[in-house]
From Swiss-Prot:
The gene is hisS. Keywords: Aminoacyl-tRNA synthetase, ATP-binding, Cytoplasm, Ligase, Nucleotide-binding, Protein biosynthesis. PANTHER family: HISTIDINE--TRNA LIGASE, MITOCHONDRIAL-RELATED, HISTIDYL-TRNA SYNTHETASE. One of its GO terms (biological process) is histidyl-tRNA aminoacylation. This is Histidine--tRNA ligase. Belongs to the class-II aminoacyl-tRNA synthetase family. It comes from Campylobacter jejuni subsp. jejuni serotype O:2 (strain ATCC 700819 / NCTC 11168). GO terms for molecular function: ATP binding; histidine-tRNA ligase activity. Homodimer.
C-alpha cells in the first residue's frame, strides 16, 4: 500500500468541512476590507526566498523543499506566501508608480520540519498583503481584520505587539545588541549563526538557556526613532479605541528577516502554551530587496491546520445541509435523476442510485449529514409525490413533486 508522505495528509470529511468554513469566513472578511483574490505558483526560484525570508531564517537554513529541475533551475516549493505575492507585484510593474494593491490568498505551503500537532510539512495558510500604503492606519486595519475573523470563528486569542524600527533606528540598535551579545558566552549554534547574519533574530530563540542570557539585552522598543515611536503609539491607541486588548512583547521579531516597524502575533492556549495561530507585520524593505522600487507593504498569514484543531476541540456540531434523494425501486431512479438535475441548479443534491428499504436510505442520509430526505416508492410514484423528511427538525410528510421547490 502506498501512503501519504510523512507530514502530509489528505483533507477530507470533518477536516474538509472546517477548512471550507475557515476559508469562507476569511474570504468574506477580507473582501469587506477591500481585498481581492490572488493566486501565485507553488513552485518558485529559490533566490526569491533567500532574498526575502533571509539567510538567517530557519526556513532557508533548514526547511525548504529545494531541487534542481530539468531546466537546471534551482527551485523550491513555496514555504510562505508573502514573497510570491510581492514578486507578482514587481513582475507586473505595479511598483513603478507605487500602485495600491490589497490581495488575499490561501493554499498549501511546504517546510521540511518535524511533524507535530498543528504543524505539518505541507500545511495551509490564509494570508493578506497590502502593498503601496505607508500609513499606520493600514497596520491597524490589518490587525482588526484578524480580530474580526477570530471573532466570527469563536476563537479566543492574545495579541502580542512590537515595533522592529526602520532604516533610521534599526542599525543603531543592531550595533548595541551585537555589543551585548559579544559580552555573553554560551549561546546555541543557531544564535551564533543568526548573530552574524541578522542579530535581531537571536531574540527569537526558544532555547531556555539563551533566553536567560538575553534577560538584560537592550530592547528595540526603547531605541525607536521619533517617527517609529509615534506610529507605534498611534497603533496602540487605535486598538484601544476599538476595544482590542494586546500585550507588548519586546522580543517579538517574527521568524522572517523582511519585517520592519509593526510586528504582531495572535496566540492561543487552546492547542498548547503560547501557540501562534496568526502573525504578520510591516515589510517596507521587501519590495526593494526583490529588485523593485522602494515601497510599502504589510500583511499577515494564518495557519489553517491550527485553526481547524481548535474548532474540532470545541466539538462544534456540523450543520446539516443539502438534499438526499432516493428510491425504493430501481425503476424510479431515472425519474429522480431528472428531478435532481433541476434541483441542482439551486441546491446541493445527493442522489442514491441504489434501491433500498426506507430505513437504510434514512441511515445513509444521516451519515451524509443531509438536511432534507426525499424518497419515492410505489405509492409516491402513483401520486406524483415524494416522501419528505426534514432530518434537522424531525418533520415528515408527503409532498407533490409539483410543489417541491415551494416546500424547499
Amino acid at each position: 500500500m502506498i501512503n501519504a508522505l510523512k507530514g502530509m495528509k489528505d483533507l477530507l470529511d470533518k477536516d474538509a468541512y472546517y477548512y471550507e468554513k475557515v476559508i469562507k469566513i476569511c474570504e468574506e472578511v477580507a473582501k469587506n476590507y477591500g481585498f481581492t483574490f490572488i493566486n501565485t505558483p507553488h513552485l518558485e526560484l529559490c533566490t526569491l526566498f533567500k532574498r526575502s525570508v533571509g539567510e538567517s531564517s530557519d526556513i532557508v537554513g533548514k526547511e525548504m523543499y529545494e531541487f534542481i529541475d530539468k531546466g537546471e533551475n534551482h527551485v523550491c516549493m513555496r514555504p510562505e506566501g508573502t514573497a510570491g505575492v510581492v514578486r507578482a507585484y514587481i513582475e507586473k510593474k505595479l511598483d513603478k508608480n507605487t500602485s495600491v494593491k490589497r490581495w488575499f490568498y490561501y493554499g498549501s505551503m511546504f517546510r521540511y520540519e518535524r511533524p507535530q500537532k498543528g504543524r505539518l510539512r505541507e500545511f495551509h495558510q490564509f494570508g493578506v498583503e497590502s502593498l503601496g500604503i505607508p500609513n499606520v492606519y493600514e497596520d491597524a486595519s490589518i490587525i482588526l481584520m484578524l480580530v474580526e475573523i477570530f471573532s466570527r470563528l469563536g476563537i479566543d486569542f492574545k495579541l502580542q505587539l512590537n515595533s522592529l524600527g526602520c532604516s533610521q533606528c534599526l542599525p543603531k540598535y543592531r550595533d548595541r545588541l551585537v555589543e551585548f551579545l559579544d559580552s555573553k558566552e554560551g549561546f546555541c549554534e543557531d544564535c551564533l549563526r543568526r548573530k552574524n547574519l541578522n542579530p535581531i533574530r537571536v531574540l527569537d530563540c526558544k532555547n531556555e538557556h539563551c533566553q536567560n542570557l538575553l534577560e538584560n539585552a537592550p530592547l528595540l522598543i526603547n531605541n525607536l526613532c521619533t517617527s517609529c515611536q509615534k506610529d507605534f503609539e498611534t497603533l496602540q491607541q487605535i486598538l484601544k479605541d476599538n476595544g482590542v486588548k494586546f500585550e507588548l512583547d519586546s522580543k517579538l521579531v517574527r521568524g522572517l528577516d523582511y519585517y520592519s516597524k509593526t510586528a504582531f502575533e495572535f496566540i492561543s492556549d487552546e492547542i498548547g502554551a503560547k501557540a501562534a495561530i496568526a502573525g504578520g507585520g510591516r515589510y517596507d524593505r521587501l519590495i526593494e530587496y526583490l529588485g523593485g522600487k522602494s515601497g510599502y507593504g504589510i500583511g499577515f498569514a494564518m495557519g489553517i491546520e491550527r485553526i481547524i484543531t481548535i474548532l474540532e476541540q470545541k466539538e462544534e456540531k456540523i450543520q446539516r445541509e443539502g438534499i438526499y434523494l432516493c428510491a425504493m425501486d430501481e425503476i424510479y431512479i431515472q425519474k429522480l435523476l431528472h428531478i435532481a438535475t433541476n434541483l441542482r441548479k439551486e441546491y446541493k443534491v445527493l442522489l442514491s442510485y441504489e434501491a433500498r428499504k426506507l430505513a437504510k436510505h434514512l441511515e445513509n442520509a444521516d451519515k451524509n449529514n443531509t438536511e432534507i430526505f426525499l424518497c419515492m416508492g410505489e405509492n409516491e410514484a402513483q401520486n406524483e409525490s415524494l416522501f419528505y423528511k426534514n432530518l434537522a427538525k424531525k418533520e415528515e410528510k408527503m409532498i407533490k413533486i409539483s410543489d417541491l421547490k415551494k416546500v424547499l
